[in-house]
């Protein structure tokens, strides 16, 4: 494992943006408004010659809405595919209906688990639950499982300390969660809690999750766990969730949503999920390939816009990405080491920016890696991507 991490560090040490575009490229403005197709296509993107490294901004703008309607419900990827949906990017709800057959699980980001005192738990966020949408999605895609994300919200260290060592607390917590999932007609839950606790409490958290899983399984419900990357971004060190924890929970849980994105920090600008790092995260987590089918490799359908003048970054999603391509018509560059595209542009007052955003080619590379490693996919999130991305799934 040390050899693997050391090799990864050497590979990625120089993976921040080192390619520089010429001033003429950076200043190039669109001579005319870039066109967008509004009709769907009879062929998927991969049959239209769009999965390429030599990408042009005008081609992305032209084709991004044009997905293959004939194969919109046909799944190509062999493993499980979980897609997150957030209420603040409502296009994700439409994506789940249009492309529902391409997913095995959909996880709306709806629910929070709160503790109000001894053996007093409440699941909030139920106002966001749309039963009409649930029925519509299930009608469109038979067999699709709805597993909303449940995040432990506003828990103090004292809350965790009280619950993790108390069987009555754990039993009441589990009962509350199961009751809500059953009453709302969910198929299970995606639990997000691991990042909130220090390493010293991980044994207690494993005990809690094991008990929760038993209760959910008794009610014929699924349970997934959101986990951080097994290799800390930008380092050759192990992350907060390693093979040790994975081996204890893999027999108990139905799957793990692995957060293999957000690799680069504010400066220097760099890739969202360099391919060698993504590979290492899976191999370190499960080196013997014993439970690979339960790992859902994280795919970001958002990008990052890095500002050199502000020494900062901010997320960029599909609509703004397309508008940036229209406004600046940049030269798009392929980073072969990270297997990601990026481009530079300059604001009149905001200085130089660098944008990394997923493309058909970068996604195809990760789908092929997932197939090779024998893992599934978890997409954050469906409302942030471009419609023709789903041709690949």
UniProtKB/Swiss-Prot annotation:
One of its GO terms (biological process) is carbohydrate metabolic process. GO terms for molecular function: chitin binding; oligosaccharide binding. It is found in: Secreted; Lysosome. Residues 1-19 form the signal peptide. Residues 79-393 form the GH18 domain. Its main location: secreted. CDD domains: GH18_SI-CLP. It holds the Pfam family Glyco_hydro_18. GO terms for cellular component: endomembrane system; extracellular region; lysosome. Keywords: Immunity, Innate immunity, Lysosome, Secreted, Signal. It comes from the Eukaryota. Saccharide- and LPS-binding protein with possible roles in pathogen sensing and endotoxin neutralization. Ligand-binding specificity relates to the length of the oligosaccharides, with preference for chitotetraose (in vitro). Belongs to the glycosyl hydrolase 18 family. Interacts with STAB1. This is Chitinase domain-containing protein 1. The lineage of its organism: Eukaryota, Metazoa, Chordata, Craniata, Vertebrata.
